[in-house]
């Protein structure tokens, strides 16, 4: 009987830790920087980089953005518009922090878009930010803008 209770307790502990991980993904914090879903009506202090690219299944492409001025927020908006395809985004900051992977359902909606705000009251790290876009589940070729 006590062995069964131990197994049940272990299963509940694992399930609880999974729930905590899922909730913490919405506010990934590192070096004071917070990554969170953006409200479509919000704006940031720096205009989003707008470049186009495309990916296929299991292909990785890279984009960059240079932050040279002091800012406390930055918007990253990966848009492909086809919710039947799934892209994955990782963000690499100049201070070595890695955020992600982030998927389309990050904000609770599957809409062919990953729209994030990068926030840091002390200032977003200056330098080159790298965006890794990966074709997680793509039929054919999927175009995107970021």
Spell out what each predicted region is:
Residues 1-30, 131:
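Secretory targeting signatures
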Residues 1-2, 62, 117-118:
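A generic local structural motif
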Residues 6-9, 53, 112, 135:
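Small side chains
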Residues 10, 17-20, 39, 54, ...:
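Intrinsic disorder/low-complexity segments
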Residues 24-73:
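Non-catalytic extracellular/lumenal accessory regions of secreted precursors
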Residues 54-105, 126:
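Acidic, Ser/Thr/Pro-rich low-complexity intrinsically disordered segments
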Residues 88-146:
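Noncatalytic accessory or regulatory domains flanking protease catalytic cores in secreted, cell-surface
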């Amino acid at each position: 009987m006590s062995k069964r209770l131990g197994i049940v307790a272990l299963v509940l502990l694992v399930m609880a830790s999974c729930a905590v991980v899922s909730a913490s993904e919405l506010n990934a914090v590192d070096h004071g920087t917070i990554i969170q879903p953006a409200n479509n009506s919000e704006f940031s202090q720096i205009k989003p980089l707008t470049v186009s690219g495309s990916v296929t299944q299991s292909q990785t492409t890279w984009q960059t953005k240079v932050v040279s001025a002091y800012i406390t927020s930055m918007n990253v908006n990966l848009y492909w518009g086809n919710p039947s395809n799934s892209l994955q985004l990782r963000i690499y900051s100049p201070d070595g922090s890695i955020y992600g992977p982030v998927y389309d359902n990050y904000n609770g909606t599957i809409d062919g878009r990953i729209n994030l705000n990068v926030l840091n009251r002390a200032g977003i790290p200056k330098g080159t930010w790298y965006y890794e876009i990966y074709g997680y589940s793509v039929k054919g070729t999927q175009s995107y803008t970021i």
